[in-house]
Amino acid sequence: MVYSYTEKKRIRKDFGKRPRVLDAPYLLSIQLDSFKKFIEQDPEGHYGLEAAFRSVFPIQSYNGNSELQYVSYRLGEPVFDVKECQIRGVTYSAPLRVKLRLVMYDKDAPAGTVKDIKEQEVYMGEIPLMTDNGTFVINGTERVIVSQLHRSPGVFFDSDKGKTHSSGKVLYNARVIPYRGSWLDFEFDPKDNVFVRIDRRRKLAASVILRALDYTTEQILDMFFDKVSFEVQGKSLVMELVPERLRGETASFDIEANGKVYVEQGRRITARHIRQLGKDGVDQIEVPVEYIVGKISSRDYVNEETGELIAAANQELNLEILALLSQAGHKSIEVLFTNDLDYGPYMSETLRVDSTTDRLSALVEIYRMMRPGEPPTREAAEQLFNSLFFSEDRYDLSAVGRMKFNSSLLREETTGSGILDHSDIIEVMKKLIEIRNGRGEVDDIDHLGNRRIRSVGEMAENQFRVGLVRVERAVKERLSLGDLDAIMPQDLINAKPISAAVKEFFGSSQLSQFMDQNNPLSEVTHKRRISALGPGGLTRERAGFEVRDVHATHYGRLCPIETPEGPNIGLINSLSVYARCNSYGFLETPYRKVVDSKVTDQIDYLSAIEEGQYVIAQANAALETDGSFSDELITARQKGDSGLHPRDHVQYMDVATNQVVSVAASLIPFLEHDDANRALMGANMQRQAVPTLRADKPLVGTGIERSVAVDSGVTAVAKRGGQVQSVDASRIVVKVNEDELVPGEAGIDIYNLTKYTRSNQNTCINQRPTVMPGEPVARGDVLADGPSTDLGELALGQNIRIAFMPWNGYNFEDSILVSERVVQQDRLTTIHIQELSCVARDTKLGSEEITADIPNVGEAALSKLDESGIVYIGAEVKGGDILVGKVTPKGETQLTPEEKLLRAIFGEKASDVKDSSLRVPNSVSGTIIDVQVFTRDGVEKDKRALEIEEMQLKEAKKDITEEFQILEGGLLARVRTLLLSIGYSEEKIASMDRERLFALTLDDESLQNQLEQLAEQYDELKAEFDKKFETKRRKITQGDDLAPGVLKIVKVYLAVKRRIQPGDKMAGRHGNKGVISKICPVEDMPYDEKGQTVEIVLNPLGVPSRMNIGQILETHMGLAAKGIGDKLNEMLKQQQELHKFRNFLQKVYDLGDTRQDVDIAALSDDQVHTLVQNLRDGLPIATPVFDGAPESSIKELLKLGDLPESGQLKMFDGRTGDMFERPVTVGYMYMLKLNHLVDDKMHARSTGSYSLVTQQPLGGKAQFGGQRFGEMEVWALEAYGAAFTLQEMLTVKSDDVNGRTKMYKNIVDGDHRMEPGMPESFNVLLKEIRSLGINIELEDK
């Protein structure tokens, strides 16, 4: 296996046995590809902005004299880059400019004669852009648009499963769902009539819609029924016979032909009888005249002579009618073929309940149903009916809908019109009746072939179209007003509605969510989330059990494990690792093709619909070296059911063992040994892990950590290979390899790192370089680690030495006992950054001012502010300290004589302002790490703002100059190489300055051209950098665009260091969560025979009932991994030769029957040295999901690390020194500190705000509320008989307004008595009873 430069520094031992066929795809592609489709120009106009424009334009005026045509669009450049947008609190977006053409026709000339054409580019608002990491910056905060899983457009056949009607009869229905437009439902009622509903309104007989399509009763019967014809021969009737139709019926007369009786009267007709009739070629039989009674006429029968109607179509026949027919000379009579078994008379019955008779009455009926109360006219009724399903403006099935519609009706072609036609409606009704007749199946709406993904691009396109449609109306009216000669396209278009629609979607849609930025995994997972909620989706309350359940088609598409606990369970899912979206929006998953029982490397992506046709083997099926199956019978899936199949039946095979699960679940080692419920918690809790101060890679991982860290975008990744030229804390410079250069560029890549910035969840984002100057790097190598990454691998927690044993009750009920050493070493210390802002506004009484001159504030409180009244960077502050001094003008009040005197002495200024400074919240303390000042255009900047501006300019200049010098150095190096190649000496070149070098004249023309080209590049580069600096300078110095009425905003960033403490929540990766109960001194912790203490003690009772055995295996494996590291340390101490290290490492990497092939001999001595140094803390191990290390391998590894194979050690009590009576399971587990910190939850209230109505204290920390003393707590006090305590709780401590003010006074006076009064909530109760019309009064006795 080939390792990149970064991977060679620390090679993870992989226990996976199945060969890697397909690497995990780029994890954010679902977001990026979708948005790319939206903004990229599509010449076909099938999707994106192009499709939206084409669907609305051209817009014609009502009189048809002019039209506005769309030509093309382009997106401009964003004004600010992503980082600037985040700092300034603005949206990262680009202006959309559309080229429109206004065409005016000559109304006097023949139609279509053009009078005038005007073309112009029109601004149509801003389109938010996606960052490289798949997020949007909206008003300065990073947001994610979650993809939606919704019901695919098309036609669905379903039944009520017998739940609607009391008889339990199953009622079938069909529903045509368009992408946009009216829904069309057909349904059976308990009497077996077919009804139609439009948009779920009042139902009409289904034949109404057929009549509205201009079909007569005769034509309708013709479409839905087979016919039987009878010949009148004298006194008897001869019926044409189709033997198949007789199956299952009981003969009401002898069936005979040619003198042979086939079935006697009263006997049931069986398949044998039918075969016999067919064999003898019987196609006619004589039937008694009574047989036709009750049959239904298929057409109108008229007396030719008199013109009188004898029998109408759909009329029941009787002997009287038969006699009349015979008299009128009708020798042949056609009736409908129906029976009770599989040819029901449904449509015929429906026609009987239908009150309409012709097209007009049907249209009027539909109009009345859609627009009740409006008087129908013929034109209005026709226009409404046509616009429902037959107009492209109002109705669109979409490409997906048409494809699903056609495949559901078993048609060959997958494409077609977006609107319905007559045959579509008729075929849907026919199929519904077929299903009712027992032929055909209903659809499963939870099948992933019937649910599709709507991603960012598609949702944004829909919103954009909504905005355009709003504009369309205004344009039409404006075009019809006349006087178009002076008008240009931009006068017609108002961009506001478009901007508003787009802004509303990105800012406040249910699917536009504040990004979960706890750690890189939570970012990736949030972008790969699939929600069934949101506009056009389900609601929590209506979603039943079936929708939430795992479906067989989720396999390899949606993760069966990762979903939230609580009301959203099953409605919010996560994409599986390898899943992708196809062009129709259905989820696909990859499979390896099997040809002649041999697995090939050809990979096919199959959607849920396609997958149903194949037999698919699991990824762990045993294979021979040539790729053929080892076993005769293979465990495989077909149509969602697992079973054993002969190997020659298998057509596909899974690509990887972790194909089924999502990214978070595939990060759990030994997942296959955990119960699903706990795995769900484990996957969810990894997303809540806070990045620790020093990231620590997991000793026991699954091998997917690297791709998560790289794809999440928190690390700096090399765009091209090369050599690291220089590294400092904030920048890495790479000189690009010659073969990766674009001709004519300097060949230097510069990576600027992010330092100590705040994430959405107030955690700290900071990047640290992982490379050294001079190191070679390849494309895709990790150059700098971000939060929670270690050498390019995801590192959410810390490897901690743990023991499973009870310890003095401190680990009762999942509590966790932690050693003081963990705190001392800052293993689980995290940095949190808070942003506090202070806004100075223009008020009615005058403008607020940011100043250090604050009334009634002592010198000490101002000690941390500078002269502008803003706290300085580096100051350590605690709750209540002033960060930004601000004064607000006060309204005029009645002055006391003393104040009047002060005014007279000191002038006006003494008391007309009040202190409204920004202070540190009560429970917070920390260090100021940054201050930003934003000043409105036209407002004078204060000294601090100017200082910050100057510093930013200096930094920008330094950055740009350094960047320029690096690139200039690159260019000059190429000039030097050029001159050296034609014989110039090093000294001579060194003695010449840049101007002289570029001014040289060379004899060789091609070299001269090259030199001139380099000189030209230098000039271009200089001009580009000057322009870059000028742009940067303008951005820094110009005033800021602030909200109306805001003069100044000061943002202060406060960093808080949080050590682990009792009350913090921690968890492993297997759903084993707990709260820290005690931080125990190191000397009291249990220790082993070597004197090594454990750092955390967990309760062994947390394992058996939870069935997450994975944690035990991880602990053993962790011990073995650490043992290898300890052995390497021992060898280093003994200063053993390098070849011994090579041999030992080779032995370690070769252990077990695995796919990994590490050749230590191929590494250089330096690389081996780096590898050994990086393995001293322990050997990182990968045990892939469902392909993990077996027990035997763990034992072998423990043996190699000189540890007992049981994984259990003899332990001693730290307090007494006594040995525990049996060996204890000790090892290393990866523990996470979750973002549920006691500091954020701890809260106490003395007095505070009260609710307006009930006068009771508010609830919650944010409102500084009280603790609710509820019903059950009252019972507890009643049980104790604590009457006075209870009285105090229900009155003065809660809502007895007079009592509590009196109590306050009494306490101030040192008198601790209380006088309870009437609780306010009693008055509320009285008022509520009175509002019900019951007069209730309290009588004082």
Curated annotation (Swiss-Prot):
State whether keyword Transferase applies.
yes
Q: What reaction(s) does this enzyme catalyze?
A: RNA(n) + a ribonucleoside 5'-triphosphate = RNA(n+1) + diphosphate
Cellular component aspect of the GO annotation: DNA-directed RNA polymerase complex
**In the record, what terms sit under GO molecular function?**
DNA binding; DNA-directed RNA polymerase activity; ribonucleoside binding
Q: Which InterPro entries match?
A: DNA-dir_RNA_pol_bsu_ext_1_sf (IPR042107), DNA-dir_RNA_pol_bsu_external_1 (IPR019462), DNA-dir_RNA_pol_su2 (IPR015712), DNA-dir_RNAP_su2_dom (IPR007120), DNA-dir_RNAP_su2_hyb_sf (IPR037033), RNA_pol_bsu_bac (IPR010243), RNA_pol_bsu_CS (IPR007121), RNA_pol_bsu_protrusion (IPR007644)
Its GO biological process terms? DNA-templated transcription
Q: Indicate yes or no for the key word Secreted.
A: no
Which Enzyme Commission numbers does its entry carry?
Answer: 2.7.7.6
User: Mind telling me which HAMAP family this protein's record contains?
Assistant: RNApol_bact_RpoB
Q: Which family does it belong to?
A: Belongs to the RNA polymerase beta chain family.
The record's note on quaternary structure and interaction partners says: The RNAP catalytic core consists of 2 alpha, 1 beta, 1 beta' and 1 omega subunit. When a sigma factor is associated with the core the holoenzyme is formed, which can initiate transcription.
Q: What is this protein called?
A: DNA-directed RNA polymerase subunit beta
